[in-house]
Amino acid sequence: TLLYLMSGLLTPRNGRVTFYDTDVRRRLPVTLQDMFLVPEEFELPSISLVSYIELNSPFYPHFSKEDMMKYLHFFEMDLSTDLGALSMGQKKKVFMSFALATNTSLLLMDEPTNGLDIPGKSQFRKFIASGMSDERTIVISTHQVRDIDRILDHVLIMDNSRVLLDEPVGNICSKFLFVESDDRELTKTAIYTLPSVQGNFLMLPNTENEETEINLELLFGATLAEPEKIIQMFHPKTIEQ
């Protein structure tokens, strides 16, 4: 729903969504040519990929055929593809490649790893990383947090329309440690735990300024279970007020 509001496909009951100071509800060409939405479910016409590109790329001034070929290569595909002969997972790879090749400044992706097999998910991470730049914002909505935790630089966690967490990954990792341990004493100090084969995954206060990779599953569980405690770690005054 949030992504559809951001793209102007849904209209908010209150307030408005702006993109470069323009209300997205107006659906102006100058707005539409600079954003792209990859929905969770979609259909592609039974035509060749070359024809699809010829029909749709003119709507996006910054589309690059060279980029399209590069992104397809990540998924071991090429331009000589008949869209009607593809599986759902293959169609998603083609559509995401086209989306990234449009070079819009805003790319919205809803559950992009759904329908991808294990090799496809690994390819997806490399694919997204290759398309990142300072000129582009990529917003990914997902419940498959393990598929994307290593490519994010900012995390937004929402629950029933309430924003519980909105922080850069660097800030999060400076506040918390994410480790796996069977140490019972260490487990007692954890903010949040999840069972693992070797004991527990632990989310701990980062009191020694150590560096660990973010565990989104732990962070998500902790934020939903104790939102006030997590908010206080970043914004103490919010709780005091």
Segments from the language model and where they lie:
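C-terminal coupling/interaction segments
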Residues: 192-241
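Helix-to-loop junction immediately C-terminal to a conserved catalytic motif
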Residues: 7
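ABC-family P-loop ATPase nucleotide-binding domains
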Residues: 37-94
